[in-house]
């Protein structure tokens, strides 16, 4: 496993990090086995949230991490009433503090390494988050030692051109951002990553293999071609060759679609690529993507030529 610097936090994080959104409630023992295998493979950052499986993700993760202080944990506070793009903003500093206290109890930790405002999806709600006391509460928690570093994550389903992060990163308010980047939504490569480099903000990439549904995406050739078909149907891509060709993605061989997807992300100047791994078998598949190289310039150029115009996720 190779490691990269997480911006001005100075933390060294593994190129792959574990997204723990799913699996804890359906099979907690397998979830814990996977967490242990992930750590043994050298992965040292795990992402979770209070809203993942109604706190079960944090609780089972906390059980898995008992006695393991060499692992960085990132959790999140969602200031909305749901994950939907049109969810109502319900954030308050009191709720944020209560959320973090609950997360720490479930995680069996005195502090979390990274706290993110979860899924900030519009400039209007970013402004509210910054002015209604929520951001101030994050800063106070950091001063109290309950949080080491603070940041926000976006919701690319409603902000595919990353307007929120383009405002947030230069503000200097955040140490870390979580953003969407995959070869079917490449806009962050130009819109956000240069700003993060300029302002020394750590970058955690989410959804490297998913589209907006989070239930399908870049997991196989048929699934990836189905995503392309949906982009064509939505008018994001033209209904003509090569997008209608069954061999559209043959140029990625001999890599599997997940390997190519992860290598695409890691070919960029990001800190870590956060990916779900619900079994040790999926972990081994993902590890192949970081050994030994990233995508070559010609393949990156072809992916950009084919899909660089897409500006929204599809369900």
Task: Please provide the spans of the model-predicted regions.
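Local beta-strand N-terminus motif with an aromatic residue
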Residues: 13, 43-46, 70-71, 112, ...
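Structured C-terminal cap/extension of enzyme domains
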Residues: 39-40, 44, 113, 191-315
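A general structural detector for well-ordered alpha-helical segments in enzyme core domains, enriched
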Residues: 2, 34-35, 57-64, 99, ...
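Glycine/proline-rich, positively charged
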Residues: 29, 36, 40, 85-191, ...
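Conserved, mostly hydrophobic/aromatic
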Residues: 6, 18, 46, 61, ...
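N-terminal binding-site loop/beta-alpha segment at the start of enzyme catalytic domains
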Residues: 1-75
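Active-site beta-loop-alpha junctions enriched in small/polar residues
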Residues: 21-23, 49-51, 76-80, 117-120, ...
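Generic structural signal for helix capping and beta-alpha/helix-loop junctions
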Residues: 25, 55, 81-83, 124, ...
